[in-house]
């Protein structure tokens, strides 16, 4: 039913208007801090691409281009080999406890959004190079060489991180890494990415599933032991795990 696609497109355009019109939305940051966030920039890539699969519109392609350009220009900071979560309004580095934050799982998720777009464009070389750079940087920051798994937060100067869960292992960074490494292997044929995929997949499936009752726990200590047994809450719903399984199945089917 095309009417649902049209409704989704209309809502997407309204969201863009709200984001672009000062005063319509409550400011995310205090007026004293002019900043922009990684979250909305990256999620608009995926949202636009999902709507585009149902209905074509130039606004969708434009938003994908704009978001990718912003990520490359403002959020990627080669001096730290990192994609930062919060930057100044023109991409300036904010040398505070919030401005130094790296969220490896979030960045890895961004990398596969861009890999997916590169694939859509017949493996566009520039997008592929950008996505792999983000993935490589973020894996280096995120993979816990001592205990395994993707860690929650890092500081780009290796200073203390504010969030108390900074060294925990949440479920969703692992699922995003499983997808991203498989996409990267499909794009390049580089065995490095297949090994990374097996690494994170093996670790996730060894630690997150409840072997007695099924489903995944959401929150592990750094060493992989369960921090709390709830399998669903305000943040953990039926999204990241099914998406990982569906995407993984589709990619493996293409590869095999």
Each PLM stretch: what is its role?
Residues 1-256:
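Glycan-recognition and catalytic cores of secretory/periplasmic carbohydrate-active enzymes
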């Amino acid at each position: 039913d095309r009417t649902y696609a049209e409704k989704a497109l209309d809502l997407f355009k309204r969201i863009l208007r709200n984001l672009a019109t000062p005063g319509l939305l409550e400011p995310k940051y205090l007026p004293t801090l002019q900043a922009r966030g990684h979250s909305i920039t990256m999620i608009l890539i995926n949202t636009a691409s999902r709507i585009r699969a149902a209905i074509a519109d130039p606004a969708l392609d434009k938003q994908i281009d704009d978001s990718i350009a912003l990520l490359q220009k403002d959020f990627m900071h080669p001096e730290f080999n990192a994609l930062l979560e919060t930057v100044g309004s023109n991409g300036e580095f904010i040398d505070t406890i919030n401005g130094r934050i790296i969220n490896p799982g979030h960045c890895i998720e961004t990398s596969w959004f861009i890999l997916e777009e590169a694939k859509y464009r017949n493996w566009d070389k520039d997008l592929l190079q950008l996505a792999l750079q983000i993935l490589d940087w973020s894996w280096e920051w995120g993979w816990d060489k001592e205990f395994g798994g993707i860690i929650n937060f890092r500081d780009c100067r290796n200073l203390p991180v504010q969030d108390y869960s900074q060294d925990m292992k949440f479920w969703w960074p692992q699922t995003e890494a499983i997808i991203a490494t498989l996409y990267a292997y499909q794009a390049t044929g580089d065995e490095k990415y297949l090994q990374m995929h097996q690494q994170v997949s093996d670790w996730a499936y060894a630690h997150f599933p409840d072997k007695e009752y099924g489903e995944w726990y959401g929150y592990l200590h750094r060493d992989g032991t369960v921090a709390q047994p709830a399998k669903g809450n305000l943040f953990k719903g039926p999204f990241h795990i099914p998406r990982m399984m569906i995407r993984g199945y589709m990619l493996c089917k293409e590869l095999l």
